[in-house]
């Protein structure tokens, strides 16, 4: 036997062999249908911006949880609308009254229903906590006194509200409240 005897020789070129292989394969799989994949469920691709919006809405509704219409905190009837938690010094309330704290966030509630106002108030508090805003101004207006009466009651129930006071004239006077919030340490 010579060296060349065990070598296989082809009469056709490699391209012809490849074409034959493909045609044989096609003949064998003719009539086969693709199986539908049903074991792995792929989550739809979500836009990161949509995730952020959903998270913000969830945080706002979580903060809305604190606002009950049934609970009546003890607020003084004399003088301007004001409130301070027991662990907040009177000096802080005085600084709010004088306008020493300048609000970084303003919420205008004019024309809102009570439910919209609760939701927006919760969203504002969530935003302030997220952005480390210590003072905010809530403009409830005067109108029929519905929001003017309820906003202080809602704010007094929230655990992150340290104090609030009727705003000085430059921030809305009798139709607004300056709110002092506790910022969590990181």
Curated annotation (Swiss-Prot):
Biased composition (Basic and acidic residues): 1-16, 49-60
Chain spans, region Disordered: 1-20, 41-60
Keywords recorded for this protein, A-Z: Endonuclease, Hydrolase, Nuclease, RNA-binding, rRNA-binding
Enzyme class: hydrolase
MF-aspect GO terms: RNA endonuclease activity; rRNA binding
Purpose of the protein: Acts as a ribosome collision sensor. Detects stalled/collided disomes (pairs of ribosomes where the leading ribosome is stalled and a second ribosome has collided with it) and endonucleolytically cleaves mRNA at the 5' boundary of the stalled ribosome. Stalled/collided disomes form a new interface (primarily via the 30S subunits) that binds SmrB. Cleaved mRNA becomes available for tmRNA ligation, leading to ribosomal subunit dissociation and rescue of stalled ribosomes.
Family classification: Belongs to the SmrB family.
Name under which the protein is recorded: Ribosome rescue factor SmrB
Lineage: Bacteria, Pseudomonadati, Pseudomonadota, Gammaproteobacteria, Vibrionales
